């Protein structure tokens, strides 16, 4: 029986070192996830974790004509014939959780999550059937400064992990008046060439007109480029809001560009929408996106509550970091003690516990290999520091620690070595 994984999934594994699969190394994931936790904490957002599967109706609310609902979800019946769906995106699940905990609901609810999502994606580079998303939802406040604040948080995350050439592409879908006028103009524009559009866009013409602008089909691109711009139909109130957000982005030094063709792949978005892209020459590709969804909470059975959020695919973030040449170390600042005999075994066991209590990640090599082989293992596994302990070290109480990355050593009595290791770890 084959033990191979199904298509579209992968292991995040600690010992991956090959350049092709380095993005799957768990140390890289820990670094990126740590940056997300740290930045969200700085902005006052709290972590939320929702179940891997929920009632299918939870995700139907993201839009009847969204690709996710129509063809990309993993849905199954349980033993009692109830329809359940593996979580395809985070926003609907967070809204459901907020309403389930309505007694604890605040006027301003600020959540973030780092969770696996499941979609039946076509097999292509950077797209997986289980993928991991860093997402954020701010529910309860509608204000240009809230939108700018969330975009600032996202920008800080990209900077913290080391991404380069980032830019925020923004558009404004507007309120009911703006959308009604724009839909009328779009319908008239596409009507005369409807039979030349892709089958999917012809379907969207009757079901969800705005989504034609999101088409990636080659036969649609000529018409999308010539389509009316929503910015020509935006009313004064919407324009004032949009301008206020852009002014704050400019003040924060966030690189942005207005893209009047930008719409999002889920039906619940209103007003401001955006994509975070990395720009390479004349090409760009998205590393995250989101926007405002002021009607979803009410559509889900709750009170009318404005909301703004985003989702970031961590696979693409890590792959892009490596493609941009970031020197991401796959190792942690870890000490390996190598006892050379049984007497040293007992000392290393005791000392390792003491070092861990000092905050130094410490492991012991119990293999009793020859020193040369033990050092090679440590180098191959990217251990930061190594200390060999034998009869002489125990007798003199003088220890030599080798820095494996700098190929240098430092030595001293036990307490001196401990102080140096604490310094090295804290200043890594």
UniProtKB/Swiss-Prot annotation:
Molecular function GO labels: ATP binding; histidine-tRNA ligase activity
Alphabetical list of CDD domains matching this protein: HisRS-like_core (cd00773)
Enzyme class: ligase
Places the protein is found: Cytoplasm
Pfam family, one: HGTP_anticodon
InterPro entries per UniProt: aa-tRNA-synth_II, aa-tRNA-synth_II/BPL/LPL, Anticodon-bd, Anticodon-bd_dom_sf, His-tRNA-ligase, HisRS-like_core, HisRS/HisZ
Catalytic activity line of the entry: tRNA(His) + L-histidine + ATP = L-histidyl-tRNA(His) + AMP + diphosphate + H(+)
EC number: 6.1.1.21
Any GO BP annotation: histidyl-tRNA aminoacylation
The entry's keywords: Aminoacyl-tRNA synthetase, ATP-binding, Cytoplasm, Ligase, Nucleotide-binding, Protein biosynthesis
Family: Belongs to the class-II aminoacyl-tRNA synthetase family.
PANTHER family associated with the record: HISTIDINE--TRNA LIGASE, MITOCHONDRIAL-RELATED (PTHR43707:SF1), HISTIDYL-TRNA SYNTHETASE (PTHR43707)
Subunit and interaction comment: Homodimer.
Name of the protein: Histidine--tRNA ligase
Gene: hisS
